[in-house]
């Protein structure tokens, strides 16, 4: 019985070593687009692996300028 558990554990570790993680979408690696205009719009952007709220100035935006946290998380995690 212990040999089966050990074999299972070794198998799990072996699979874990060779699992390839998918790289983040390039969109998710961009800095938050603050914008240069005078607006003060609440938006979400991926920062250090989390979708965080920031204030967007209203122009010169990028594709990672999400209106909702759920949409940011759906695209970037």
Swiss-Prot record:
Gene Ontology CC annotations of this record: extracellular space
UniProt keyword Secreted present: yes
Purpose: Serine protease inhibitor that inhibits trypsin (Ki=550 nM) and thrombin (Ki=26000 nM). Exerts anticoagulant activity probably by the way of inhibiting thrombin.
This protein's name: Kunitz-type serine protease inhibitor bicolin
Annotated site location: Reactive bond homolog: 40-41
SUPFAM superfamilies the record matches: BPTI-like
Source domain of life: Eukaryota
Stretches assigned to the BPTI/Kunitz inhibitor domain: 28-76
Record localization: Secreted
UniProt keyword annotations, A-Z: Blood coagulation cascade inhibiting toxin, Disulfide bond, Hemostasis impairing toxin, Protease inhibitor, Secreted, Serine protease inhibitor, Signal, Toxin
Family the entry assigns: Belongs to the venom Kunitz-type family.
MF terms (GO), sorted A to Z: serine-type endopeptidase inhibitor activity; toxin activity
Pfam families (UniProt xref): Kunitz_BPTI
């Amino acid at each position: 019985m212990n040999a089966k558990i050990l074999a299972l554990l070794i198998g799990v570790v072996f699979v874990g070593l060779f699992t390839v993680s998918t790289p983040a979408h390039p969109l998710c690696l961009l800095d938050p687009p603050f914008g240069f205009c005078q607006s003060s719009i609440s938006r979400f952007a991926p920062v250090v692996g989390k979708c965080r709220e920031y204030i967007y100035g209203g122009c010169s935006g990028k594709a990672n300028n999400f209106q909702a946290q759920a949409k940011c998380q759906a695209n970037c995690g």
